[in-house]
Amino acid sequence: MTNQSTIDKLIEMRLTAMADAFRIQMDDPTMKEVPFEDRFGMLVDIEYSNRKNNRLKRLIRQAEFEQPDASIAAIDYQSGRKLNKALISRLATCEYITEYRNIFITGATGSGKTYMACAFGMEACKHYYTVRYVRLPDLLLDLQAARDSGTFSTVLKKYTKPVVLIIDEWLLLKLTEAEARNLFELIHKIRKKSSTIFCSQFRESEWYQQICGGESTLADAIMDRITYDSYKIDIESIDPSKDLSMREVYGLDPAMAK
């Protein structure tokens, strides 16, 4: 069997990284002195790393992060915000995912909620968990459209399948009865089967009022399913008069680019 035939078969089996590495080995005279087991191990390592990297890129792309460059390592703890660094570091290990626990991130507009949620999502991707980011307004529209078209169960799977679901702009506007009902179906399906990261401008104590004015039993049903055993991060301002928004800190504010 010729070397080219071997390369062609590797490519046919979609072992392209291994094929490229094998070609490089064949062109390198010094590799003739390397034992076969070592050379073969090098080829396997290259193919393995390539597949891992491609898988990570695919997970990040499919997550549709609002801020795909977010990083736990880049979180600014000196920006006038009170942050629990120990808790953030613990959550970055993704242990909460294996425990099926949720994360609540609350804070004012521009406090860095979305950035932090996406940073947690990125860490989940690095652990090869599936993640999906969605704004609650878009989620509600998607669920209602599916309800109207008779495809609710199919669309619901789009949000129940990921191991980590990030819901941004959580309860920014009060829910109608129909919206709360659709949302309850989702929350009920993913409870203790996956983890959800909620980002909200409102404190947890105010969420009841945002769900049908707190009058519907759906408010109790939803809150009961998401609050138990959840981790809570409240991004508090130490000195509002000196604060920069996190959009400015991370260079995400279009006005800063002018």
Question: Which residues fall in each region the model found?
Answer:
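Short glycine-rich substrate-engagement loop in P-loop NTPases that contacts/grips substrate
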Residues: R81-S89, V131-T160
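Walker A/P-loop nucleotide-binding motif
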Residues: Y100-M116
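N-terminal pre-Walker A segment at the start of P-loop NTPase domains
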Residues: A70-C94
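Interdomain "pre-motor" coupling segment immediately N-terminal to P-loop NTPase/helicase cores
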Residues: T16-Q67
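Post-Walker A helix-loop "phosphate-sensing" segment adjacent to the P-loop in P-loop NTPases
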Residues: G121-V134
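Loop/turn-to-beta-strand initiation segments
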Residues: R101, Y128-T130, K161-V164, K192-F198
